[in-house]
């Protein structure tokens, strides 16, 4: 059996570009759906050129244009959505088109974070996660084969400044820690998320399951992360612990979109939502399924900042 033909919707976005690159690199015939106007953005135009040179086919269309969706989906076996937060609900249009085409072997909706079915997040993250839950239930109700990729933290969002807003490098004097710093989280380099995602599309073990990236070398509590950084720079940082009550107050007082970021951080670093449950029968873990993937460890990632 040849490798599945893959359509990626949202391929010019932050995680979408990594998924698209991995798809081409792993030898899948890859199509991306982009609006005709995308090429008028210079940064996106350059990205589209690099996609073309790696053999990716560009098709024009959008989530609002049903005919374009159907036309693109007819050409492939697998659909991956990596659309951003503002378009989560619009994935109902993808579901409708997949249903109409009727030949899709797998749909991966936009996930790439915490498992939204296992969360104790507060608003506004709670509402954002609820939209993803709604999409999951719609996929299941239509009987569309799926894989949900729960890849946890993007390394690039968090590790370059150890979660300290406004800093461009990890701190060398003082660090603010939410909660007691003991909840464990998982930090995965974006390129590796792309690789694990594409590895899963033709794998019967991930069919109608959640693929968790709970990579052993990348699972750290905040305290462990700080200790690793201190060891690298040979210096002890002053640690400021923010109790949960204060974190909740900050969320309530912070305007959008800052409150979303803090409420997601609360879910991860105070509640431990990435690791506070066992992976059950409806889940599989990426590094166990694909031991051949040499992912970048947190230890290696931090070396660039020393």
Swiss-Prot record:
Give the record's keywords alphabetically: NADP, Oxidoreductase
One Pfam family per UniProt: NmrA
Reactions the enzyme catalyzes:
(-)-dehydrodiconiferyl alcohol + NADPH + H(+) = (S)-isodihydrodehydrodiconiferyl alcohol + NADP(+); (+)-dehydrodiconiferyl alcohol + NADPH + H(+) = (R)-isodihydrodehydrodiconiferyl alcohol + NADP(+); (2R,3S)-dihydrodehydrodiconiferyl alcohol + NADPH + H(+) = (S)-tetrahydrodehydrodiconiferyl alcohol + NADP(+); (2S,3R)-dihydrodehydrodiconiferyl alcohol + NADPH + H(+) = (R)-tetrahydrodehydrodiconiferyl alcohol + NADP(+)
**InterPro entries xref list:** NAD(P)-bd_dom_sf (IPR036291), NmrA-like (IPR008030), NmrA-type/Isoflavone_red_sf (IPR050608), PCBER-like (IPR045312)
Q: What class of enzyme is it?
A: oxidoreductase
Per the entry, induction is:
Induced by UV-B, wounding, salicylate, ethephon, 5-aminolevulinic acid and abscisic acid (ABA).
Q: Which GO terms describe its molecular function?
A: oxidoreductase activity, acting on NAD(P)H, oxygen as acceptor
What biological processes does GO assign it?
lignan biosynthetic process
Q: What does this protein do?
A: Oxidoreductase involved in lignan biosynthesis. Catalyzes the NADPH-dependent reduction of phenylcoumaran benzylic ethers. Converts dehydrodiconiferyl alcohol (DDC) to isodihydrodehydrodiconiferyl alcohol (IDDDC), and dihydrodehydrodiconiferyl alcohol (DDDC) to tetrahydrodehydrodiconiferyl alcohol (TDDC). May regulate changes in lignin content and accumulation of flavonoids.
What protein name is recorded for this chain?
Phenylcoumaran benzylic ether reductase IRL1
Q: Which organism is it from?
A: Ginkgo biloba (Ginkgo)
| Taxon lineage | Eukaryota, Viridiplantae, Streptophyta, Embryophyta, Tracheophyta
Q: What gene is this protein translated from?
A: IRL1
């Amino acid at each position: 059996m040849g490798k599945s033909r893959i359509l990626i919707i949202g391929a010019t976005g932050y995680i979408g570009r990594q998924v698209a690159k991995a798809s081409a690199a792993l030898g899948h015939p890859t199509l991306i759906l982009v609006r005709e106007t995308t090429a008028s953005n210079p940064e996106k135009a350059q990205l589209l050129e690099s996609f073309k040179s790696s053999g990716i086919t560009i098709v024009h269309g959008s989530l609002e244009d049903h005919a374009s969706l159907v036309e693109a989906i007819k050409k492939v076996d697998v659909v991956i959505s990596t659309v951003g937060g503002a378009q989560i609900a619009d994935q109902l249009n993808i579901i409708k088109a997949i249903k109409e085409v009727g030949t899709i072997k797998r749909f991966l909706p936009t996930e790439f974070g915490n498992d939204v079915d296992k969360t104790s997040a507060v608003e506004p993250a709670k509402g954002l996660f609820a939209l993803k839950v709604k999409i999951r239930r719609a996929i299941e109700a239509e009987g569309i084969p799926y894989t949900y990729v729960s890849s946890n933290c993007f390394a690039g969002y968090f590790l370059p400044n150890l979660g300290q807003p406004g800093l461009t490098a990890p701190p060398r004097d003082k660090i603010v820690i939410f909660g007691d710093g003991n909840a464990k989280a998982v930090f995965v380099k974006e390129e590796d998320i792309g690789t694990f995602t594409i590895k899963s599309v033709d794998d019967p073990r991930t069919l109608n399951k959640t693929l968790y990236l709970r990579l052993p070398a990348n699972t750290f509590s905040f305290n462990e992360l700080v200790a690793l950084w201190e060891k690298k720079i040979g210096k002890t940082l002053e640690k400021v612990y923010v109790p949960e009550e204060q974190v909740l107050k900050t969320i309530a007082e912070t305007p959008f979109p800052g409150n979303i970021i803090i409420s997601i951080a609360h879910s991860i670093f105070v509640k431990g939502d990435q690791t506070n449950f066992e992976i059950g029968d409806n889940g599989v873990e990426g590094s166990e399924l694909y031991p051949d993937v040499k992912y970048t460890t947190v230890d290696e990632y931090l070396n660039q900042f020393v």
